[in-house]
Curated annotation (Swiss-Prot):
Protein name, UniProt field: Carbamoyl phosphate synthase large chain
Binding site for Mn(2+) 1: 285, 299
Origin superkingdom: Bacteria
Domain comment quoted from the record: The large subunit is composed of 2 ATP-grasp domains that are involved in binding the 2 ATP molecules needed for carbamoyl phosphate synthesis. The N-terminal ATP-grasp domain (referred to as the carboxyphosphate synthetic component) catalyzes the ATP-dependent phosphorylation of hydrogencarbonate to carboxyphosphate and the subsequent nucleophilic attack by ammonia to form a carbamate intermediate.
Pathway: Amino-acid biosynthesis; L-arginine biosynthesis; carbamoyl phosphate from bicarbonate: step 1/1; Pyrimidine metabolism; UMP biosynthesis via de novo pathway; (S)-dihydroorotate from bicarbonate: step 1/3
Gene that encodes it: carB
Positions with a binding annotation for Mg(2+) 2: 299, 301
Enzyme Commission no: 6.3.4.16, 6.3.5.5
GO terms of molecular function: ATP binding; carbamoyl-phosphate synthase (ammonia) activity; carbamoyl-phosphate synthase (glutamine-hydrolyzing) activity; metal ion binding
Location of region: Oligomerization domain: 403-547
Domain ATP-grasp: 133-328, 676-870
Species this protein is from: Clavibacter sepedonicus (Clavibacter michiganensis subsp. sepedonicus)
Residues that hold ATP 1 according to the record: 129, 169, 175-176, 208, 210, 215, 241-243, 285, 299
Cofactor note: Binds 4 Mg(2+) or Mn(2+) ions per subunit.
Length: 1096
């Protein structure tokens, strides 16, 4: 069946901001879909609110809308663009829920738009817990005993029937949001309340406990002719009870017999048919009781999912690309396999290697959070590795996490076997290492299985790894057989060095002297049956290589590794654009990365892809292979965040050419003493500051500067470890915590700055070629200095800075670029306080705001910077038309305004008492993603950003106000405006008194900690929980008064109420209310570009 000729234009709905449970994998999926649809001659209209994505680049769609993903906005786009169809199955749960809402409101029928990729009935059957349960039972397959509840009362009643513990699973949510295991009625009531709140259909499934069962997934695809393929089987190493996104997973499934696999496959194919997915893919999860083999179906996703991206990267089978073709009418047997070019997509992939995915967590950002892993997903990223056996893939994946202690180690272990086993009973980040240590300390595999319920086969593999480590330790010398045995099981040179008590370079020298180097294999989808035509490689210590280096001029680009808070999709964006630009310039582009979620690890983003850990050893081996032919022009390290920058010195020491800013210049910017010299020479001012490597030094420096001080480690991203410290005792506590984490100490000094209160923070992204500075954009932060730039909302162009101040910022940036010796990208952060411009820090690399600037002003910063790194001048880039003559420092008055807003994951993290962690923002970054609002002025742009990030602001209702003493003067005008808009005002006694003096009538409510008066006197927390408050304004008052504020903020986050913790943020919101009332206009980036050209 050929492509449908009645579909000429398609509206693709993206997934919105990066959040836990829905991350960069949907940018990868959406980018593939947009590409293939355009290749098929379909006009693509895209809507997504996330500016950090590749898919929102104007080149991937004919009309690109960076707008909130709401029914109102989607209808306006449909009216304007008149698409024939809407494709929602590649944008995660966000897109699927949006499409269902369009159907329920009759918008699709009203405008004659078809839903493709999955019918509404199929989505309902797959997502509605009761419908799916009934369907599975009809098929003859087994499910856990369960009931669907729509009220708390129903849930309590059903729990009596099912018994404790039981599982709560909300409908139509992602990443297990609102789910969990309830062991008591108290836990049940809290979890059901959360689940009902999280579910758009206000329903939860209560299910018998299957804790400790083995968990599997199948990725399937089906077309309109009923051709069905199982793309990949995935097995969770962690048993049921840990969300699959938080579990170590392996593909293909390794502990199923062929009979068990075929049975699971048959069930999966029957379910996809019954659900009715006939133009795309789906993911089905199963559980198997290890005691008797009972197999049950857990749930399904009737769309491309997080696991689909992993399955695509694991197999080389592009699920999203094929799903897009199926959606416009093709059959599987009509779609060629990109990798072999001779087999169709109806051939199921075959693997002759093992793939392991390991999650990356960010509990260090939320120290109060309970670190136990449950059915609610908490990981913020993941790394993937490919090996010829499980032990190799596992060890490579663990070292890809780039976290201290994440790999297996063989140093001193002070804990006893009993302590290690007890620790391993609770699933946490790093449990696999605890298991390794327990086995090493003498625990038996049976004891480990009893504690963890991890399948014995996986435990035996760790026993094997420990045995190899013992052989390395006990060998008389580090000879070739010993080294080869270690390498065959994934040991790094650093691990071997630790076991032997020698240096890593000594191991590397011995290995090279013995002629032991990796070869590189190819991912081909067919286990070598057909030749692979796409260069997608992984390392192995087998004897035969499958690659031949080209004789071209080539550039290696180091990716940013697994996503984490502070280093996310924004850096992948820069890497991808560098690859595109350098390829267009005639270079062979070689990407090294280990993140399965990203566009950079798609097999057709670069000329050659190495799916490898970003460690010095692994990168050097790739460099060695590529230098065997052609010319390696250099390695790009300034686009992959701190991961890539951290390798610069080691690569340079090994004689590898570094493109762009040199490692010594990077040190000039990072090392406080050297950077101060540059500022002094340029006549620039920094806040009073100093450095320390010992606690006594730190105390002296802090007392000289004067409290409060801002403290942070060197060489970190995302403000990791950054805090505002008010006294010596807190400084002592801070220093010990950071030293324990190994991020400060000798060679890693602590940076101490005077904290600037009431200052405006400014960001600038620019390119410098050694002669000319080109400004990408100057951004003004909405929140005052003290909140990490990644968590602060910002506006481009600035809305309160004068031309003179902007020019001062540009001049200072030029002086810094020249002094440091930048070649390529530079990000500088400034603050203006009391009329003085302070330099906070300079980063000679890509920043997380590069995509935002590029989308807001239409300037391809990453592409231009990559060409500057290989010697192209800014003048040449202007002459070629890649860079506009007018840079981002000179934005016309009538230009649109763009606002970036951070999206925060507080609802995912709870304390051991079940409370949501405190949502107060500070100098350490906590956001997982971002959105952009763009419109003709700041109020409209800000309103859009709030709608996209938080679901918008209510136009009426009740507002609660409780602010710190320092904010009581500045709170009056915003609250007065809210009252004029019709809001009823509630306040605590102290705040109400101030408001009353200024003519604002506020009803006094008691604090959470105050004793109730006679009669019914609900606290503010009670009112929030009863849904009697619509907006919460609460600014923190310092540590001693935090208890009340914390309870208020936690209740607001749990109830999904708009929460303002800074006056600046509130003031911006109040200014946007008129814009919200007027409704949003929608404009594509392409239309903005046309208007921009007309102004030039």
């Amino acid at each position: 069946m050929p492509k449908r000729d009645d579909i000429n234009s398609v509206l693709v709905i993206g997934s919105g901001p990066i959040v836990i449970g829905q991350a960069a994998e949907f940018d990868y999926s959406g980018t593939q879909a947009c590409r293939v649809l355009r290749e098929e001659g379909v006009r693509v209209i895209l809507v997504n609110s996330n500016p950090a994505t590749i898919m929102t680049d104007p080149g991937f769609a004919d009309a690109t809308y960076i707008e909130p993903i709401t029914s109102e906005v989607l209808e306006k786009i449909i009216i304007k663009e008149r698409p024939d169809a809407v494709l929602p199955t590649l944008g995660g749960q966000t897109a699927l829920n949006a499409a269902i809402r369009l159907d329920e409101l009759g918008i699709l029928a009203k405008h004659g738009v078809e839903l493709i990729g999955a019918k509404v009935e199929a989505i309902q059957k797959g997502e509605d817990r009761q419908l799916f349960k009934d369907l599975v039972i009809e098929s003859g397959a087994d499910v856990a005993r369960s009931h669907v509840a729509k009220t708390l009362e129903q849930a309590v009643e059903f729990a009596e029937d099912l018994g404790y513990p039981l599982v709560i699973r909300p409908s139509f949510t992602m990443g297990g949001l609102g789910s969990g295991f309830a062991h008591t009625r108290q836990e049940l009531e809290r979890m059901v309340a959360d689940g009902l709140q999280s579910s758009p259909t206000t329903e939860v499934l209560l299910e018998e406990s299957i804790l400790g069962w083995k968990e599997y997934e199948l990725e399937l695809m089906r077309d309109t002719a009923d051709n069905t393929v199982v793309v990949c089987s995935i097995e969770n190493v962690d048993p049921v009870g840990v969300h699959t996104g938080d579990s170590i997973t392996v593909a293909p499934a390794l502990t199923l017999t062929d009979r068990e696999y075929q049975h699971m496959r048959d069930i999966g194919i029957d379910i996809i048919r019954r659900v009715g997915v006939d133009t795309g893919g789906c993911n089905i999860q199963f559980a198997v009781d290890p005691t008797n083999g009972r197999l049950i179906v857990i749930e399904m996703n009737p769309r491309v999912s997080r696991s689909s991206a992993l399955a695509s990267k694991a197999t080389g089978f592009p699920i999203a690309k094929i799903a897009a073709k199926l959606a416009i009418g093709y059959r599987l047997d009509e779609i060629p396999n990109d990798i072999t070019k001779v087999t169709p997509a109806s051939f199921e992939p075959t693997l002759d290697y093992v793939v392991v995915k390991v999650p990356r967590f960010a509990f260090e950002k939320f120290p109060a959070a309970d670190a136990e892993l449950t059915t609610t997903m908490k990981s913020v990223g993941e790394a993937m590795a490919i090996g010829r056996n499980y032990s190799t893939a596992l060890q490579k994946a663990l070292r890809s996490l780039e976290k201290r202690g994440s790999s297996f180690h063989w140093g001193a272990e002070s804990r006893s076997v009993e302590e290690l086993l007890e620790t391993s009973r609770i699933p946490t980040d790093g449990r696999i290492v605890t298991v390794q240590q327990a086995l090493r300390a003498g625990a038996t595999p049976e004891q480990v299985f009893d504690a963890t319920k991890i399948d014995p086969w996986f435990i035996d593999q760790i026993v094997l790894i420990n045995e190899v480590a013992d052989a390395v330790r006990d060998a008389d010398e580090l000879d070739a057989p010993t080294l080869r045995e270690a390498k065959d099981h994934g040991f790094s040179d650093a691990q071997i060095a630790e076991i032997r008590g020698i240096g890593e370079q000594e191991v590397r020298d011995a290995r090279h002297a013995a002629g032991i180097r990796p070869v590189f294999k190819t991912v081909d989808t067919c286990a070598g049956e057909f030749p692979a035509l796409t260069p997608y490689h992984y390392s192995s210590y087998d004897s035969e290589t499958e690659i031949v280096p080209s004789d071209r001029r080539k550039v290696i680009i180091l990716g940013s590794g697994p996503n984490r808070i502070g280093q996310g999709i924004e850096f992948d964006y820069s890497c991808v654009h560098a690859s595109f630009a350098l390829a267009d310039a005639g270079f062979e582009t070689i990407m090294i990365n280990c993140n399965p979620e990203t566009v950079s690890t798609d097999y057709d983003t670069s000329d050659r892809l190495y799916f490898e850990p970003l460690t010095l050893e692994d990168v050097l081996e790739i460099v060695h292979v590529e230098q065997q032919a052609g010319e390696l022009v250099g390695v790009v390290v300034q686009l992959g965040g701190q991961t890539a920058l951290g390798l610069a010195k080691g690569l340079e020491a090994a004689g590898v050419p570094i493109l762009g800013t040199s490692p010594s210049a990077i040190d000039l910017a990072e090392e406080r003493g050297l950077f101060s010299g540059i500022l002094d020479a340029a006549g620039l001012v920094a806040p009073r500051n100093g450095t320390a490597v010992a606690i006594d030094e730190a105390v002296v420096v802090a007392e000289e500067i004067g409290y409060p001080v801002l403290v942070r480690p060197s060489y970190v991203l995302g403000g990791r470890g950054m805090e505002i410290v008010f006294d010596t005792a807190t400084l002592h506590d801070y220093f010990l915590r950071m030293a324990d984490q190994g991020i400060i100490g000798e060679g890693k000094p602590l940076l101490i700055d005077r904290f600037l209160d009431d200052a405006i923070e400014i960001d600038i992204d620019a390119i410098y070629d050694g002669t000319e500075l080109y400004v990408g954009g100057v951004m003004e932060h909405i929140e005052e200095a003290g909140i990490h730039s990644g968590d602060s909302s910002c506006t481009l162009p600035p809305v309160t800075l004068g031309r003179g101040q902007i020019q001062q910022v540009v001049d200072a940036t030029r002086a810094i670029a020249e002094g440091v010796g930048v070649r390529g990208l530079l990000n500088v952060q400034f603050a203006i306080g009391a009329g003085v411009l302070y330099v906070l820090e300079a980063n000679p690399r890509a920043s997380r705001t590069v995509p935002f600037v590029s989308k807001a002003l239409g300037i391809p910063l990453a592409k231009a910077a990559s060409l500057v790194m290989v010697g192209t001048s800014i003048a040449e880039l202007k002459a070629s038309g890649l860079l506009p003559e007018r840079d981002g420092s000179d934005v016309p008055m009538d230009s649109p305004v763009a606002v970036k807003e951070a999206v925060l994951p507080f609802k995912r993290f709870r304390t051991k008492d079940g409370l949501i962690v405190d949502s107060v923002l500070g100098p350490e970054m906590r956001s997982t993603g971002e959105v952009m609002g763009i419109d003709r002025d700041f109020p409209r742009a800000f309103a859009k950003s709030q709608e996209a990030a938080f679901g918008g602001l209510p136009l009426s209702g009740t507002v609660f106000v409780s602010v710190a003493d320092r904010d009581k003067r500045s709170i009056v005008l915003p609250v007065l405006r809210l009252q004029q808009l019709g809001f009823e005002v509630l306040a605590t006694a102290g705040t109400a008194e101030i408001l009353s003096r200024n003519g604002i009538q506020a009803r006094v409510v008691r604090k959470y900690s105050e004793e109730p008066a006679a009669g019914d006197s609900p606290s503010i927390v009670d009112l929030i929980n009863r849904d009697e408050v619509d907006v919460v304004i609460n600014t923190p008052s310092g540590r001693t008064a935090r208890a009340d504020g914390y309870e208020i903020r936690a209740a607001a986050v749990a109830a999904d109420k708009p929460l303002f913790t800074t006056i600046a943020q509130l003031t911006a919101a109040v200014a946007s209310f008129d814009a919200i009332r007027a409704g949003f206009d929608v404009t594509s980036l392409q239309d903005y570009a046309i208007a921009r050209e007309a102004r030039r």
